[in-house]
């Protein structure tokens, strides 16, 4: 399969760019590089113009399917399945709040175009979430799947070892993701305690050697605490001296309760894929070739 992504923050020399595990974060972007390292059988293609990137990928790789990362509003490319990712914030206090007063790009009516909803939850109780799903999403009649990132251990950035936990020892958390609270909750669930300190950086932050030295100094000040980072940050931090001893949070997706769905997500998606893949792949490739002719 092929993943088409805009590659936020990427600075490739040419487009489209096929991202390999050996690419640099500056060239490929942190998220495409993480995808390339985590999914070795997939082709990760960076191109802000998804139609061009899709045609290029189809011509070279003849994929069974193409996945658009953040493509719900990308109208130049027709889709067969639209999966809309929502958070508890989207369903509760952020419901229907379109930019600039909120994080939504479109109003509630756009949700009718979804094939299914994926709701990303975090550890702990979330008051009002089940009711919001029942009253705000379920009436749309589309399958709804909840999921969470479950921690499964730690790994050294330099590849020297893995651990299930830190045996109760102190740690600090350095993270440059959009929702630091999620990383804090995931780390605390795995390690059984809150971090001594959280060092939040901007999403997609380009870590420097000075940042690494600052993180190490904060850890020393906290009693030689361990340093824990997210996998997204690790692909950038591992390039710098002194970061090899940092721990990366290893996570996996676990699905939870579902609504309007008779089957688990994997089975539901597999059935849809089998219905659509062969026929529509041919249509997509023909349309791309005609457009570029």
Task: Enumerate the language-model features and the residues they cover.
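Phosphate/Mg2+-binding loops and adjacent switch elements
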Residues: 7-140, 146
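C-terminal accessory "lid"/substrate-recognition subdomains
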Residues: 91-226, 279-293
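Short, high-confidence coil segments that cap the C-terminus of an alpha-helix
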Residues: 1, 62-64, 222-225
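Phosphate-bearing ligand-interacting subdomains
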Residues: 216, 223-242
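Short, flexible loop segments at boundaries between secondary-structure elements
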Residues: 201-206, 244-275
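Conserved beta-strand elements of the Class I
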Residues: 2-4, 84, 170-174
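Short hydrophobic/aromatic-enriched beta-strand-loop microsegments
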Residues: 65-66, 84-86, 144, 193-200, ...
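Short active-site-adjacent structural elements
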Residues: 182, 207-209, 235-240, 255-258
């Amino acid at each position: 399969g092929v993943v088409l992504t805009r590659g936020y923050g990427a600075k490739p020399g040419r487009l489209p760019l096929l991202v390999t595990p050996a690419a640099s974060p500056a060239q490929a972007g942190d998220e495409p590089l993480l995808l390339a390292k985590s999914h070795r059988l997939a082709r990760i293609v960076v191109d802000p113009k998804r139609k061009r990137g899709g045609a290029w990928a189809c011509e070279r790789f003849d994929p069974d399917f193409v996945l658009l990362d953040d493509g719900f509003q990308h109208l130049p490319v027709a889709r067969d399945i639209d999966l809309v990712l929502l958070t508890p914030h989207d369903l509760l206090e952020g419901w229907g709040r379109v930019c600039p007063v909120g994080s939504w790009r479109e109003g509630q009516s756009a949700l009718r175009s979804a094939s299914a909803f994926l709701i990303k939850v975090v550890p702990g109780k979330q008051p009002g979430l089940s009711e919001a799903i029942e009253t705000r999403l379920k009436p749309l009649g589309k399958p709804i799947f909840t999921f969470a990132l479950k921690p499964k251990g730690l790994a050294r950035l330099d590849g020297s070892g893995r651990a299930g936990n830190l045996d109760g020892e102190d740690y600090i958390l350095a993270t440059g993701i959009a929702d630091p609270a999620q990383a804090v909750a995931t780390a605390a669930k795995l390690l059984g305690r809150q971090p001594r300190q959280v060092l939040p950086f901007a999403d997609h932050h380009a870590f420097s050697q000075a940042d690494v030295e600052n993180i190490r100094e904060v850890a020393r000040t906290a009693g030689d605490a361990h340093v824990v980072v997210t996998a997204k940050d690790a692909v950038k931090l591992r390039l710098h001296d002194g970061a090899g001893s940092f721990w990366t949070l290893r996570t996996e997706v676990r699905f939870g309760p579902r609504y309007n769905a008779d089957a688990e997500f994997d089975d539901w998606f597999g059935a849809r894929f089998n219905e659509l893949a062969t026929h529509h792949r041919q249509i997509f490739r023909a349309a791309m070739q005609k457009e570029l002719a």
